[in-house]
Design a protein with these regions (language model features):
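Intrinsic low-complexity, intrinsically disordered segments enriched in polar/basic residues
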Residues: 1-3, 24, 50
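Cleavable N-terminal signal peptides
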Residues: 11-14, 24
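Short hydrophobic/aromatic-rich motifs at helix boundaries and adjacent loops
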Residues: 13-18, 41
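N-terminal segment of the mature folded domain
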Residues: 27-101
Length: 101
């Protein structure tokens, strides 16, 4: 339940941030990572999109926890699904790329 609450919070924050974007920009939240977390993320993403009347599109992919962190640290996605804590080397990759979390 706690993980789901964090995910809902993360989606809400991402949604709020995207509302500040210009109307011409596509409002998309990109999520990728753990297949373990995927079913919960997909369900929350669907409900979030319904709540926002599809004004914000949420994409959810599966590339594994490590793959999700790589994409996150490269700035390719907004949220990394993870079934484990971020590793030190992944933290360093994010820091080197200027990605803050």
């Amino acid at each position: 339940m706690f993980k789901q609450s964090k995910l809902v919070s993360a989606l809400a924050v991402a949604g709020i941030a995207l509302f500040g974007a210009s109307a011409a920009q596509a409002q998309i939240v990109k999520i990728d990572g753990s297949s373990t977390v995927y079913p919960i993320t997909e369900a929350v993403a669907e409900e979030f999109q319904k709540a926002k009347k599809n004004a914000i599109k949420v994409t959810v992919g599966i590339s594994g926890t490590g793959g999700g962190f790589k994409k996150f640290c490269r700035g390719e996605i907004d949220i990394a699904n993870a079934s484990r804590p971020i590793l030190k080397k992944e933290m360093e990759a994010c820091k080197e790329a200027g990605i803050e979390y």
